[in-house]
């Protein structure tokens, strides 16, 4: 059947016109989509990304394939994403937060290149603000944190928040390019970085990406274990399906770098579609990221890692490989703990929804590793369960940090919380410790403060009388500026010094070097009774030093009791009691002058027995006459338990040991002439005692000492001013004489 030429010509012209109209409509759609992307990129503060189609012949520049694979790739094209503009980060941002931005503009259905109506969806956008770290960290975060209120205001959009993703990337021991295979790729493939198939209940909320570059050769030494997969009804990539995976190489290069590394990952290859951009096994998608300026502002360092570069996940991330970090989410996000992940959706649900790649705008920023990064001083406060983590970096820490890379995906609901002031924590701990010490000192010195009128008294204006518990800031300033004299340090006991040292040690161990603090470990507290007394005791400084030395052995209670009794007796506060004691001692001593020691002991024992037996017979006769039964006359004294506990014996033995050791050391020092002047003084004293011994015996000297003990304190208390004046004159003359002697004796001029 012959066709009419005119009809065929008309039909051909109609088809050509229809094809031109269709092509014009597609060009208008492309221009509208490109204009929409440019407007949205400008609104979000992103740089536009150009999409180019180029041949794989140029891949040899980037070392993508070897010579064998290059022969099979001739003539093929791939998608090339590039950005020829450097994104200048905001220098005033130090904390980075992000949340998915909502689409506010109504776009034409033609822009979506998909069938069916499409409501505005949350399109994940990325914004980098000050993401330049000294340790070569690269972070990608969504836009300003102020968008949180807008995103969470809609309860429907609240249901779309998705779990955080955390991927830990290790460094190869040989520091070379290597292929990294994700062990759990088949089961956890839906948790990859480029999942771009959000549903009505789930969508990506925010993404934080951090990379690290090789510290030694300037190359990327870490690879991202993920694969982006093509989809029939979707432009670029979509969630994985159950189809058989195939290999598709992915290359990430940095402009300005001499070489680039490549890593191949398994991926799913589906049937081709004429809608959108999609890679095939023959296409090689390449992402080129521009290097920022060297004077980029510093950023937060990545989370603290251990020696092998492992970053500790937070929250429920410890329970599974890709968990949900809910520490920084507000209450609305916490309610979504049971939200299903992308992997739980069926293939039908994934294929029934379409995501439009024309509405995505990504900005990838990377930091440049230079020698100046070694001097970084930035630190990060890793938020999570209110835990403060301050990281101080040094040369070694920077080199160890270069051995690892990491990638984190997290929801951030707002600005990170500011870390608590370390000085306040230290002040609270110090205040509690000093309050405990002060309470113990008050209890121990309570009895000694009311023992007698001559007890040491503190000046009310003295710094030690001020309350130990004060305002935190005032106490911190006082602890760093207050100073003590040497005499105050000498009067402190060893026990208090030990307690104060433990206090400072606990404070230092709690902070772990997180902040510099001026710790003064030589500022112990002092007990009340250990201050130098305002009024001298009758026995002078030597007696005071002995009493203070007995404090750590006998304890406060025995010392206080005996000290009170001795003061009452020596100052004749109770005349009757003092008279009985003084008379008994003198009687015994005078008896020793007339009789031997054995005779004196025997006579004293017979006298005591005569008195007690006589009193016992007298009471018995009296009870028989009066026909009463009062019992034993000494029953009350017999009921008193007279025994020394083990603790008391140890205390008295310790006191005796202290005096014995002191005397032995002093005699050794004098007889072995450790100090020539002191040895000469001791020799003069012994020479004078020879004359005293010729005139008086030991008992006479002992009687004179007892009389002096019970008389001199009263006389000194009454005529203290005059006695001090004469004692000062005597001391001055003695010092002059000793100085003259030292000047004449060789070898003694160096002594003070």
Swiss-Prot record:
Pfam families: Reticulon. The gene is rtn1-b. Residues 334-361 have a biased composition (Basic and acidic residues). Keywords: Endoplasmic reticulum, Membrane, Nucleus, Transmembrane, Transmembrane helix. GO terms for cellular component: endoplasmic reticulum membrane; neuron projection; nucleus; postsynaptic density. Isoform A and isoform C are both expressed in the animal hemisphere (presumptive neural ectoderm) of blastula and gastrula stage embryos, and along the anterior neural border, in the panplacodal primordium, and in the dorsolateral side of archenteron roof of late neurula embryos. At the tailbud stage, expression of the isoforms begin to differ. Isoform A localizes to the cranial placodes including the trigeminal placode, lateral line placode, olfactory placode and otic vesicle. The lineage of its organism: Eukaryota, Metazoa, Chordata, Craniata, Vertebrata. Inhibits amyloid precursor protein processing, probably by blocking BACE1 activity. The keyword Aminoacyl-tRNA synthetase does not apply. Its main location: endoplasmic reticulum. This is Reticulon-1-B. It comes from the Eukaryota. Induction: Isoform A is repressed by thyroid hormone. It comes from Xenopus laevis (African clawed frog). PANTHER family: RETICULON-1 (PTHR45799:SF5), RETICULON-LIKE PROTEIN (PTHR45799).
